[in-house]
Amino acid sequence: MKRKLASVFSVVAIVIASNGYVMAEGDMTEQKPMEIKVQLGDSSNAMRFYPANLEFETGKLYKLVLHNSSGTKHYFSSEGLSRSVFTRKAQVLGPDGKTIAEIKGTIREIEVYPNGTAEWWFVPIKTGVLNDLKCTIKGHAEAGMVGTITIK
């Protein structure tokens, strides 16, 4: 009985160890981020995200660079994206492009002021098509500042 039990535990240990090894594809802390740039509005104050359709893949590190080139502030808001990613950090960049603030924790939306830039570093952990990207300032989504996010 003890031998059978020991054999079962040995097999289970081997299966668990081999599955962990197969699933781990390198050190994720060493990943270089894939940079995706999104422009919020433009110099003519059009209410748009450029591009409006974003695509990500689970397990990859992204640096989402949000730049507002318009004369009014905008929000990048997607509750679905917030729930579908692990956030590493968000950064606020100064006029010279250097980081002036770094935020840790869950990000719900990012407000970017005129001519400002922010970065959101994250790893998607859940697949889906998210149709909730919008600017939450009154009238902006209605004017066309909406988008779709696909996570494969």
Tell where the protein language model's regions lie, with residue ranges:
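Short beta-strand and strand-turn-strand segments in soluble, beta-rich domains
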Residues: A46, G94-T106
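Sec/Tat signal peptide C-region and signal peptidase I cleavage site
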Residues: N19-A24
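Short aromatic-acidic-glycine turn motif
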Residues: S82-G94
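Asparagine-centered strand-capping/turn motif at beta-strand->loop junctions
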Residues: L66-S70
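Bacterial N-terminal signal peptides that target proteins for export
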Residues: M1-F9
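N-terminal edge beta-strand
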Residues: T29-L61
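Extracellular/periplasmic metallocenter environments
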Residues: E25, E30, I103-K152
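Bacterial N-terminal signal peptides
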Residues: F9-A17
